[in-house]
Each structure stands twice: as structure tokens, then as C-alpha cells.
């Protein structure tokens, strides 16, 4: 759901919106989870969850009126956080970057997935080499995304952040899952309250620090 009066341009014709996301509980343990999430409307990338925006959990025993009251009591505060988030991305727009900085961000973002790991280069001879960040499926796709982002938006920290986010919002999916609607649902769940939410937030921190 869109939050009233919570839309701002990061740059010309590049609006971002604050949205209230409601996800029902699959196991019926609670009624629903609610988060406030920052979206880029041009490609509908989830940019990041707002700081300290852990999902609100509504128990079935709470009244509807009490739930609504809880939401209304924090919306104004979240609008302030959204404005701060917009300023972060405006700063990224002004940060031109080089290939070495792209490498730095991707290496740090996926450090645990390549560090101290091996890649088999010959199964018959059982030879291996050290794994590096370029071996990762995520990085290969993100590098392709960056070619388009840099062409459209320049070589900026903002373009780098969007190239990473686009992968998690529109491209990630297990190769054994062929149904795109199922892949999209899994991506959404991981982005809202799963491991991908942390990766998206970390990518913003790394790009902002360049």
C-alpha cells in the first residue's frame, strides 16, 4: 500500500515511494506481518527496508482497531526515515565510481560465498583453484545489469546499487523452479523478511560508503 505524501525524486523523473507491505502468515501463528519498505518506481526495485523497520506482528487476539492505531502511530516517524533514505540515494547519484570500487563492493557483499572456497576445474584430474567473486551466479548476472545501468545512469554508486537490487527483485530464482510466478513469490518473501532483505540493505551501506 502506498503511504500518503511519501513520494520523492532521487533525480529528475526517478521517483521513489514509501510503501506499507502486509504479508499474511502462512502457518496461522499470527494474523500478518507489516513492514515499511522503500521502492524505486522506475523498475519497482525494493531499495531497502527503513532502518529498524522490523515487521510489526499482529496477533489474532488483537482487535482490528488496536492494530490500526499502532500503524497510524508510527507512519509519521517512518516518513521521516524515508526522507533520510532519499537523501542517501541522492548522495549516491553524485558519487562517480571506478571498476575497482565495483569489485570492492561485490567482493565484500558476497565474501562468505567465495572466501576460502574452491572451484573444480577438472573432475577427472580432480584439480581445483581458489574461488573468487566472479565465479558466483549472482555476480555474473549483476555485472550484466551494470552494463545497462551505467549506460542509462552513468557510473555512479546509485547505478551500482540498482544493478544489485534489480537482481534480487526480478531475476533471482532456483534453476529447478520453472514456474515464474512461484519464483516471483519466493523472491518477494525473501526480500520482505528473508535473507535477501539483509543483502539489499548491506548493498546500500557498501555503496553509500564509497
How would you describe each model-predicted region?
Residues 6-210:
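Intrinsically disordered, low-complexity regions enriched in serine/threonine
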